Curated annotation (Swiss-Prot):
GO terms for molecular function: DNA binding. It comes from Nitrosomonas eutropha (strain DSM 101675 / C91 / Nm57). It comes from the Bacteria. GO terms for cellular component: bacterial nucleoid; cytosol. This is Nucleoid-associated protein Neut_0591. InterPro entries: YbaB-like_sf, YbaB/EbfC. It is found in: Cytoplasm, Nucleoid. SUPFAM superfamilies: YbaB-like. The lineage of its organism: Bacteria, Pseudomonadati, Pseudomonadota, Betaproteobacteria, Nitrosomonadales. The keyword DNA-binding applies. Belongs to the YbaB/EbfC family. Keywords: Cytoplasm, DNA-binding. Homodimer. It holds the Pfam family YbaB_DNA_bd. NCBIfam families: DNA_YbaB_EbfC (TIGR00103).
Length: 107
């Protein structure tokens, strides 16, 4: 029984180290969200830090409301891409845990 508990503790510590390493890696991965056929782009890290927003010069001076909508859409696209990239990378860390399908980690 003690051997199993010791083994479990060792696995938990290794998992914690792997999670920390993955979080550091995710902080360096950038994704790009787009809207308006690429006329508005948002570059974001997998920590949800916005690095850049690129707006095509043809949109400057146009309808302010439309531009705001495009920026919001590009941000939302970037967030969805961050979530997908994060899940993909975290799958390598959590694959041996036997978590139920659809269960997100970290919770």
């Amino acid at each position: 029984m003690k051997a199993n508990l010791g083994n479990l503790m060792k696995q938990a510590q290794q998992m914690q180290e792997n999670m920390k390493a993955m979080q550091e890696k995710l902080a360096t991965i950038e994704v790009e969200g787009q809207a308006g056929a690429g006329m508005v782009k948002v570059i974001m890290t997998c920590r949800h830090d916005v690095k850049r927003i690129n707006i095509d010069s043809s949109l400057i001076g146009d309808d302010k409301e439309m531009l705001e909508d495009l920026v919001a859409a590009a941000m939302n696209d970037a967030v969805r891409r961050v979530e997908a990239a994060t899940q993909e990378h975290m799958a390598s860390v959590t694959s041996g845990l036997g978590l139920p399908a659809g269960m997100k980690f970290p919770f």
